[in-house]
């Protein structure tokens, strides 16, 4: 079973944030697309005990990834009032948004593309986002 160190989880969160930030001007937040794609890529790399969580941020639904150790929240930066919070925190520490629901992780690239497609205007934008995530997210 593969585990992520804090450094590796932070690096992956930063890389995911970088990709998502390039797409945020399209409208709604990219917490769900970023979280589902990151979780799928982590699972493909052999990281176990991953789940996508969602809860209310006070401004609508908010999505993040949880491993057995870390809460990885790569799209916090899209909210100016949350910029000071770290993108990765231990799941044992209070302070994150409470999870209202846990979601299944896409089992294939096709499922990942389908799952995140609602966050984009068309299939080409969806495909571009997933390709950028695949290129950015590399586990060492």
Briefly describe each language-model feature range.
Residues 1-140:
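A structural boundary/capping signal
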């Amino acid at each position: 079973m593969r585990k992520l160190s804090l450094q590796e989880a932070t690096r992956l969160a930063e890389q995911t944030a970088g990709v998502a930030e390039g797409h945020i001007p399209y409208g709604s937040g990219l917490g769900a697309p970023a979280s589902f794609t990151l979780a799928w890529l982590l699972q493909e790399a052999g990281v176990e005990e991953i789940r996508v969580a969602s809860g209310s941020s006070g401004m609508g639904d908010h999505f993040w990834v949880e491993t057995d150790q870390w809460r990885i929240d790569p799209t916090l930066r899209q909210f100016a009032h949350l910029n000071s919070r770290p993108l990765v925190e231990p799941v044992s520490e209070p302070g994150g948004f409470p999870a209202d629901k846990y979601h299944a992780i896409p089992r294939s690239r096709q499922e990942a593309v389908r799952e995140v497609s609602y966050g984009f205007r068309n299939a080409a934008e969806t495909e571009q986002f997933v390709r950028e995530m695949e290129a950015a997210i590399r586990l060492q």
